From Swiss-Prot:
Residue ranges constituting the MTTase N-terminal domain according to the UniProt record: 33-151
Subcellular location: Cytoplasm
Keywords: 4Fe-4S, Cytoplasm, Iron, Iron-sulfur, Metal-binding, S-adenosyl-L-methionine, Transferase, tRNA processing
Domain Radical SAM core, chain residue ranges per copy: 174-404
Protein family (similarity comment): Belongs to the methylthiotransferase family. MiaB subfamily.
InterPro entries: Elp3/MiaA/NifB-like_rSAM (IPR006638), Methylthiotransferase (IPR005839), Methylthiotransferase_CS (IPR020612), Methylthiotransferase_N (IPR013848), Methylthiotransferase_N_sf (IPR038135), MiaB_methiolase (IPR006463), rSAM (IPR007197), rSAM_horseshoe (IPR023404)
Sites where the protein binds [4Fe-4S] cluster 1: C42, C78, C112
Protein name: tRNA-2-methylthio-N(6)-dimethylallyladenosine synthase
Chain residues that bind [4Fe-4S] cluster 2: C188, C192, C195
Organism: Alkaliphilus oremlandii (strain OhILAs)
GO terms for cellular component: cytosol
Function: Catalyzes the methylthiolation of N6-(dimethylallyl)adenosine (i(6)A), leading to the formation of 2-methylthio-N6-(dimethylallyl)adenosine (ms(2)i(6)A) at position 37 in tRNAs that read codons beginning with uridine.
Amino acid sequence: MSKRAKVVVSPEKIKKQSDIIEELKIYNRGKNKKYMITTYGCQMNEHDSETLSGMLENMGYSITTNKEEANLIIYNTCCVRENAELKVYGNIGALKALKKKNEDLIIAVCGCMMQQPQVVKEIKRKYRHVDLVFGTHNLYRFPELLSRSMETEGMFIEVWDEETGIVEGLPANRKYDLKGFINIMYGCNNFCTYCIVPYTRGRERSREVADIIREATDLANNGTKEITLLGQNVNSYGKTLEHPIDFADLLRALNKIDGIERIRFMTSHPKDLSERLIDAIAECDKVCEHFHLPFQSGSNQILKAMNRKYTKENYLSIVKKLKDRIPNIGLTTDIIVGFPGETEEDFQDTLDIVQEARYDSAYTFLYSIREGTPAAKMQNQIDEKVKQERFSRLLDKVNEISAEINQSYLNKVVEVLVEGPSKTDSNKLMGRTRQNKLVNFSGDESLIGKLVNVRIVECRTFSLNGEVIQE
């Protein structure tokens, strides 16, 4: 699938779904139908849920957070961690009693978990009250799938093993007004040995630049101030397109859009990080000085077993280049503890990277066996007690450095995009710096949606408190 012409879903197929949306809108008129979506996992799943929500709003449904009043409940699932899967099973099971009380309730389960045959088999066997099951590759067909499930006795299942083309023009009900997610690519070609994503999201496919710019421009025209570009590995953007282009070119093009104040992106694979990209981040005024660069392990032996295709030394040289070129950059990362075969020496190498790179924050994970991945069959699986002990030490080191970095912001003036009321104090506002630091401060609600200067007066491990500087 190297050419764009091979991966586009035809306008006729999209129109068919639009026609079904209109039919369901007429059918639902005056019925006050409500839906609820629970999303697990990454920002790509969140964006998929925004698409499902947009379709449902166009069908005449309105959103609710109350299961008791919902006519349709959707779980959009994640299979990266076992814990997320267990939560899904628990929540689906808990709906059985509600289904008995309300036989007209439609329960749908979708997302990455459904791309695994053993999961679908488990749902068919143990959760027969589920009405609709679909995966990641046919999400654009949701209107048709919902319609067919309404006409079907029992469970309706449609999961495609192969990825579809890139779909343009689907409606989306954005979770945030000021911030918007934009998928720039789908799938992954890296096949890290611990990761199930290439098997659930398919191989890498990039969207055309013109389509991405059109979506970003539409968001800007509707009041969006900040966009986050999404991909499993944004650094390899453009490789499947017919005309040569890379992620650095895309950033420079998006930087020219009027109305967009900030550009963020995730996730980046270290092996594909070019100096051209570092230059683009440094030179584009709207691209935020924040970089999420997962390293997963500091041990070259473990990195090789993970199929990460870089070494500890490679990674640290990239960090140095980023900090030299963008001195005020905020760095975040992903770290896995307890990968099969990890020794105490290997773990010390991980702590070494944390100490040298000095991350603003880190997403830390205990290694979780994922059926269907090479790592699941590896020898020397690590004892859970050892994992937990190492995880605790890692967390202590990460939090210690995070607190030190945050303390360096005391009395500094930072630019904050005001997002809304603080989650910890409803009398305050909250927003984020360009480095993605969470800042709480007092201010009038008229500031929401604006860029303001805030002086930091208190520093905490995970957030900052400040005072607005009046112009």
